[in-house]
Amino acid sequence: MTNLQRFKNRKALITGAAGGIGSALVKALKKEGALVAITDLNTSNVDADANFDGDLQNSQFCDELPLLAKDKLNGLDILCNVAGVITRGNINEVTDEEYNLTMKVNVEAPFRLCRASIPIMKKGSAIVNVSSCWGLRSGPNHPLYTMSKAAIASLTQSLGLDHAHQGIRVNAVCPNEVNTSMIRSGFEVRGLNPDKAIEELNKTIPLGRIAEPEDIVDVILF
């Protein structure tokens, strides 16, 4: 396959870079010539041009990260908010701690990162926020997760309207099931074998399989 180099010398910041979608996105961007800064709790196993280990629950870290990435890469053209957590259980089962974690990582962190990135971005820059199909149409027993992803979908629309005149594109990607540790952990919590559960789930998909991280990356890069 031809290496298109669509992102040659573009500077990108990716959150959740140690996860399934995040790590695949880092590889794809670097393959196409981008300079990539990344963050996660531990990024030691991810090859990037700038690694910033940190906790997205830390507001100051989120506020400062885009400028740190810009200084390290000599610019910032792309922000991809990929990091996320999922909390399972109905409203009477989830705790205040789980609420705070979900809102901090899934909503406040992307908000702060977008707010800090936009002033230092030039015309032609892009922001991609990873929401979820459940952010558009809710599913059962995940009120915290679905609420947080709906917030990100709404935030994305607002930012797209507010900053189009600056030539900054803001889009959301809303995946369904993706073969990552997040979905596998859900099967484990329910006492299911993740591999067998995914095999059964694959049978419900017209293509014969759920999405792989690389499928979502293709959409993000578009």
Spans of model-derived segments:
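Substrate-binding pocket helix/loop in short-chain dehydrogenase/reductase
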Residues: 90-91, 95-100, 201
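Residue(s) in the substrate-gating loop at a strand-loop-helix junction
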Residues: 132
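Active-site helix of classical SDR
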Residues: 114, 148
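Active-site loop-to-helix junction immediately N-terminal to the catalytic Tyr of the SDR YXXXK motif
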Residues: 94, 138-146, 158, 186
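Alpha-helical segment proximal to the catalytic Tyr-Lys
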Residues: 119, 161-165
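Canonical Rossmann dinucleotide-binding motif of NAD(H)/NADP(H)-dependent dehydrogenases/reductases
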Residues: 5-35
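Active-site loop immediately N-terminal to the catalytic Tyr-X3-Lys motif
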Residues: 92, 137-143, 165-166, 208
